[in-house]
């Protein structure tokens, strides 16, 4: 009886220790996540911009939902921030960009802390009233049973024309008096997720 009691206690303890990571989802950590994009003007001058407000979840069924607050764009020039909001993103009509996809969470659960794996990840980007299916290569890093990082391995190229942003780019070019602004935009990201406890 004592042996059975010890075995039962062992399995109960193991279940309690593993439950948060095995059965809960993950919450995006905005303070340790970033989405960057590069604008190229005059065919040779590149500048890095980013968004300050990100939110999202990776659910225990593998469904990922990421929200980018477009009004949080930061270009390090105040008037340019305002112009992007009004002329490019039209945040009065389209305040957010949304990313959705499915991850292999079973593979993540089986990973050891400190291990990584690379995968060609498909997802849907909902931006400026248009949805596009896209694929990019990402690296998943399991820092611990409570924290993972999903980051781009190489820049992803967003074509402004796919999201009806060409007119906005042209407005920015005209008001800034530039000869050109590229409509092909490189994007990189690093997203940190913390396990949700129940």
Model regions and ranges:
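N-terminal signal peptide c-region/cleavage motif recognized by signal peptidases
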Residues: 19-20
